[in-house]
């Protein structure tokens, strides 16, 4: 595995801090409370790329499992038994997918960044809802119907998460044009061309 440069380590550390901070920024919407955690996992993939984005999010998850209170309800290895832990695992794959998608094929654009985010959102929902359903029904003995899990963990969460996808695409494009972006070697020429 390729060694990380100082810049890459700093950016990974920055995103670990941003994801942690976003977890505790609570925005009340009606009877629900939303955080900015998803926004920063989206940006981790877009800005850092597939490999580093996944590394940054995985490091955040590992810190929480080691007991550092970076999750919404604390931390520690027992957190894997939380119904919502599947979302944390899914964020790793989501960051990888976002970074991979925007660095393959066509030039980077707002639309391409948004598609990467929406694809990542689907990944998070599929894994997160499945984990929530399985843990609720077979681990903590708090059974819920699958439809209820889909409704409360997916359908009702989709509008605010879609807004975060829109915001992350805009911020990601600004980062791309300003050079705050990890560019794979074979895409450097394309990056310079778009930013020119």
Summary of predicted features, one role per range:
Residues 1-56:
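Hydrophobic transmembrane alpha-helices
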Residues 1-6, 176, 180-196:
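Short, charged juxtamembrane terminal tails flanking transmembrane helices
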Residues 10, 14, 18, 40, ...:
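Lipid-exposed faces of alpha-helical membrane segments in multi-pass integral membrane proteins
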Residues 10, 14, 77-126:
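Short helix-perturbing small/polar motifs within transmembrane alpha-helices
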Residues 18, 22, 26, 44, ...:
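Alpha-helical membrane-inserting segments
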Residues 22-34, 59-94:
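Interfacial aromatic-anchored transmembrane helix boundaries in multi-pass membrane proteins
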Residues 40, 51-52, 85, 112, ...:
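Residue-level recognition of membrane-helix boundary sites in multi-pass small-molecule transporters
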Residues 109-188:
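Membrane-embedded alpha-helical hairpins and interfacial helices in multi-pass inner-membrane proteins
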């Amino acid at each position: 595995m390729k060694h990380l440069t100082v810049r890459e380590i700093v950016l990974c550390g920055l995103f670990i801090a941003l994801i942690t901070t976003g977890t505790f920024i609570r925005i009340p919407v009606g009877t629900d409370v939303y955080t900015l955690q998803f926004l920063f996992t989206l940006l981790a993939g877009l800005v850092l790329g597939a490999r580093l984005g996944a590394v940054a999010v995985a490091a955040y998850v590992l810190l929480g499992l080691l007991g550092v209170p970076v999750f919404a309800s604390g931390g520690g290895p027992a957190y894997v038994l939380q119904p919502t832990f599947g979302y944390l695992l899914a964020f790793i794959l989501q960051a990888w997918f976002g970074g991979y998608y925007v660095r393959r094929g066509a030039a980077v654009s707002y639309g391409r960044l948004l598609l990467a985010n929406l694809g990542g959102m689907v990944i998070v929902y599929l894994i997160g809802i499945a984990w929530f359903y399985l843990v609720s029904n077979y681990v903590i003995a708090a059974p819920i119907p699958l439809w209820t899990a889909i409704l409360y963990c997916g359908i009702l969460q989709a509008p605010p998460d879609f807004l975060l996808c829109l915001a992350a695409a805009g911020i990601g494009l600004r980062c791309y044009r300003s050079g705050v972006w990890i560019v794979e070697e074979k895409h450097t020429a394309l990056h310079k061309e778009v930013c020119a």
